[in-house]
Amino acid sequence: MDEEEIKYFVRVRNTDLDGTKAVHIALTGIKGIGPHTSRTITALAAVDPHAILGKLDDESVGRIANAVDTYTEQVPDWMVNRQKDVYTGEVRHLLGTDLTMMNDDDVNRMRKMRSYRGIRHETGQKVRGQRTKSTGRTGTTVGVKRKKD
């Protein structure tokens, strides 16, 4: 490839990635892949993480896509985002809309079983034990009103 020839959008796992960024940064554009996971994927694909994604040849992009697809089989169980799935019991790494739908299903399951966390989700309150007396208030502020003379 010439120096000027660059693909501005690279399609990986049904997501358009920014071709002007480094590989390890561009991969974080896929929901479910963070900085640590993207570094691991570039190592599995044998691609320089600091290379510009749009300048890579199709074979390298294919290796990256293959590493993303086979990520679960190549890393330990503690490195995936869905360990011991509630329904199937398997270890999976969810990406994109699958991750969003599974999170919504988990919240709905907690609501249906009326667990403490489910009730907090239902009422729109904080779920993870944060303080609620002074922070997280919604609505308009009243402020200080003067007394009528």
Curated annotation (Swiss-Prot):
Gene Ontology CC: one annotated term: cytosol
InterPro entries: Rbsml_uS13_C, Ribosomal_uS13, Ribosomal_uS13-like_H2TH, Ribosomal_uS13_archaeal, Ribosomal_uS13_CS
Pfam families the record matches: Ribosomal_S13 (PF00416)
GO biological process: translation
GO molecular function list: rRNA binding; structural constituent of ribosome
Claim: rRNA-binding is one of the keywords in the record: yes
Family label: Belongs to the universal ribosomal protein uS13 family.
Name of the protein described by the UniProt record: Small ribosomal subunit protein uS13
Species per Swiss-Prot/TrEMBL record: Methanoculleus marisnigri (strain ATCC 35101 / DSM 1498 / JR1)
Species lineage: Archaea, Methanobacteriati, Methanobacteriota, Stenosarchaea group, Methanomicrobia
Gene of this entry: rps13
